């Protein structure tokens, strides 16, 4: 999850919507299973399979749990046909004891937001940045490590803060950072550094099937870069991804 995201969801569902929300931190389980796994499709399937296991274990502690609701949207289905696997499309175990409910699976993201507004959900939830099912697992490229995951979470938080300050949060459809699994040579305090690069990804789109790269003001990119290099340990370089979709997908993995 992104920095502060679990707390935000708990706040909305428990305190604002008065829902009987059960929160489970299964971080260690996922990271143990993903150790040394660098192939993106394998990572997605491991994350999806373990997600169902955790859900099943928690559901068995309660009575009358018969349904599994998922936020599958139409681009998930379209992309799963030959582009990349989505754990919620064809990745669930066949012997699952729950009836699957996917109320928005034939809608695009902009249409889902319309439904959310009609239902009266808080704007903070309706307008949240799109987030892949495997979470930060597909933005921490290659085999996931705790140090790169921490750098990813912190750099993403910096990016979101600076975009919000610049008034870009509502103008750019999706923005996030990526941390690859290779290091880069840098200089810090007059000494050689060999640390991770951080890649900034920002796109505008309507349906998530095609996307363009917005022109972010240079001053904003400089502010993001300076803060990441000063505040995020283990990072010595910041890059900006200029690739539209197609050819590149919005997510790197």
Question: What is each stretch, according to the model?
Answer:
Residues 1-253:
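ATP/NTP-dependent adenylation/nucleotidyl-transfer catalytic domains that generate, transfer
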């Amino acid at each position: 999850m992104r920095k502060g995201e679990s707390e935000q969801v708990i706040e909305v569902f428990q305190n604002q919507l008065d829902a009987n929300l059960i929160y489970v931190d299964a971080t260690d389980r996922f990271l143990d299973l993903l150790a040394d796994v660098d192939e993106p499709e394998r990572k997605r399937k491991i994350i999806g399979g373990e997600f169902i296991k955790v859900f099943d274990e928690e559901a068995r502690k309660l009575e009358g749990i018969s349904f599994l609701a998922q936020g599958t949207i139409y681009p998930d289905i379209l992309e799963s046909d030959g582009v990349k696997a989505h754990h919620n499309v064809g990745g669930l175990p066949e012997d699952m004891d729950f009836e699957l409910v996917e109320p928005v699976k034939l809608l695009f993201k902009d249409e889902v937001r319309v439904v959310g507004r009609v239902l009266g959900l808080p704007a903070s939830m309706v307008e949240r940045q799109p987030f892949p099912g495997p979470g930060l697992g597909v933005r921490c490229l290659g085999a996931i490590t705790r140090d790169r995951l921490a750098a990813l979470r912190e750099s993403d938080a910096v990016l979101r803060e600076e975009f919000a300050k610049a008034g870009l949060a509502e103008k750019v459809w999706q923005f996030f950072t990526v941390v690859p699994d290779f290091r880069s040579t840098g200089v810090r305090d007059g000494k050689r550094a060999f640390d991770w690069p951080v890649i900034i990804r920002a796109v505008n789109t309507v349906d998530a099937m095609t996307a363009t790269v917005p022109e972010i003001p240079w001053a904003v990119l400089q502010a993001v870069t300076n803060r990441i290099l000063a505040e995020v340990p283990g990072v010595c370089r910041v890059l900006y991804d200029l690739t539209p979709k197609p050819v590149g997908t919005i997510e790197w993995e």
